Amino acid sequence: LHKEYRRQRQMCIRDRPYGDRSKEEIISLTRDSVNFLLSKDVKIIIFGCNTATAVAMSTIQKEVPLQIIGVVQSGALAAARATETKNVAVIGTKATVNSHSYLKEIQYRDPEIQVSEFAQPKLAPLAEEDPAEEIKQAVVSESLAPLRNIDYDTLVLGCTHYPLLRDEIVAVVGQDKKIVDPADQVAQYTYNVLRRDGLFAADDSDTTHEYYTTGEAKKFTEITRQWMNDETIVGHHVNAED
């Protein structure tokens, strides 16, 4: 989204990791972030977190007047289109995997697709800590070991952190596997919604992008600059519960 639609003003809030939290906690924390964004007068909200999408989106959507776009639905659509053998593997947080959201969404589109889900509690912290390359590769190799025992041609990166480990993941699963990053489909769907509803900003409008985090602003800035390939990004600390 940042790359494709720089002329559209964007606000991003990054909260603490949700993957190991209870359903009630995830919904409450997600609600706080959504209310913060609503206070900024946004026109559409995107859940860039698979866990929040899987666990909280259906509840929060009933509470807000704006459309919410989630990554799970987009990732499931991309996976269903990509697989040729009808065998898909999904890696994600415990909460995402336990919700079986990808299983339901993929099989809703094609009931014949076999979906294997694997919780990966070590990968999101690994992406945030960004240790030495040999440590990253060792942790990824150990975490993805169960995938060696199944047949699949498509792998869904079911956590927004995982694209930061894409090279390490490909080194384990092999170049022959199709890697689905839901972000690509989300960007296209968001474009369609903005165009359909006449929400695109004019070319001469304010395009200042704002980035917030409930965590450490310095670390958030470093990670986001790396991820977005944009050295101009500056993160600001905020308490979304205020």
Model-derived segments and their meaning:
Residues 76-79, 120-128, 177-198:
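Short, flexible loop segments at boundaries between secondary-structure elements
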Residues 22-36, 135-143:
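Glycine-rich, highly charged phosphate/nucleotide-binding loops
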Residues 204-242:
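ATP/nucleoside-binding phosphotransfer catalytic cores, i.e., glycine-rich phosphate-binding loops
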Residues 1-13:
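Single conserved hydrophobic/aromatic residue that forms the stacking wall/gate
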Residues 37-95:
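Glycine/small-residue-rich loop that forms an oxyanion/phosphate-binding "nest" at active or ligand-binding sites
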Residues 69-124, 185-186:
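Conserved beta-alpha
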Residues 10, 14-31, 125-131:
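N-terminal beta-loop-helix "entrance" segment that forms/cooperates
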Residues 105-173:
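Active-site rim beta-loop-alpha module in soluble metabolic enzymes
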